[in-house]
Amino acid sequence: MSTQPPAILALEDGRTFRGRSWASHGEVCGEIVFNTSMTGYQEILTDPSYAGQIVCMTYPLIGNYGVNQEDSESGRPWVEGFVVREASRITSNWRAEESLADYLRRWNIVALEGIDTRALVRHIRDKGAMRACLSAIDLNEASLIEKARQSPPMENRELASVVTTSEPYDFPADRAERFHVVCFDFGVKRNSLKELAQRGVRTTVVPSSTAAAEVLAMKPDGVFLSNGPGDPASMNSEVEEIKQLVTATVPIFGICFGHQLLGRAFGAKTFKLTFGHRGGNQPVKEVAGQGVEITAHNHGFAVEASSLPSEVEVTHLNLNDQCVEGMRHRTLPIISVQYHPEAAPGPHDAEHHFTRFIKLMEANKVKV
């Protein structure tokens, strides 16, 4: 008989799932979403883009290789809660420094196991991502459903200020420095900074609310707009700063949330997807050619293609639902992708987009 205390996941539409608590025995509310990656749970947990969300893993066994410091994408886990079919009791990897359960307890992350995750994922797929409450304290289903309904929705929710750096800092180049880039930290992952560093880029990471004038005063070779959590429609002041960067003709590369903010700076609209794209197996097609990339995603919003101005070209589309996955300005050195070219976790098909950014900066230097 299990010694783990009972826990309940209650969704705002009244659906409930009873299982067992296996980490911190607390209570949290957030948007319930699912991730289809088979591995990479540590990178998922520490991705700031998951702030405000309870993440369900579709793979049935999670935690077997433990946790280490090196693979974290930030200094702490950002998920509100974590849901799995079965949490591994065995930690078997030479790089492991602690078990997943111990790691989650250390950070007071509430986690649930022993539910039918297939049923939960099908429900989210059919009904959409929604508010939920996960508790090992309150076991009254009606009470938890009401708490879920009272929690803040993801629409119009601003979370970048929660995850961004409080002070600017430099991430040095791994080799001879070729370029200096300023990164707007909306929730940046370490592997993005590493990808730039490997290409000879020194990156100055600045808070999400940094003014464009302050960035331009640094005379950067380029600007990187990072991934991050929340609704891009809540970031009006940041979008206004990005507009100033666009008119300054500095090379810009946006990914994920940064891609959405760039779209809004171009005058386009963004909208909420039914259940989003989260996982390492999303097929993306290059519009101008025949190339297809298998890509890593983590987003619940997308840019509305029909609202983009004529000077912005859609470069990539999702083969599953035809969402805009990439853009470029026809005359300015500006590109973006909706997915995560740095992967972590995920395939490496899209790493070349960092090289595209390097080439934009090279060409701009020659022009100047």
Question: Predicted segments — roles?
Answer:
Residues 1-213, 217-218, 232, 344-349, ...:
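RNA-binding accessory domains that recognize and position tRNA/RNA substrates
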Residues 87, 228, 301, 332, ...:
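Flexible loop residues that form catalytic
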Residues 110, 180, 251-253, 269, ...:
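Proline-centered loop/turn at the N-terminus of a beta-strand
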Residues 180-185, 295-296, 335-339:
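Active-site-proximal beta-strand elements of phosphoester/diester hydrolases
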Residues 221-222, 226-297, 302, 346-364:
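Cysteine-nucleophile active-site neighborhood
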Residues 291-332, 368:
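Catalytic beta-strand/loop cores that center a nucleophilic Ser/Cys/Thr
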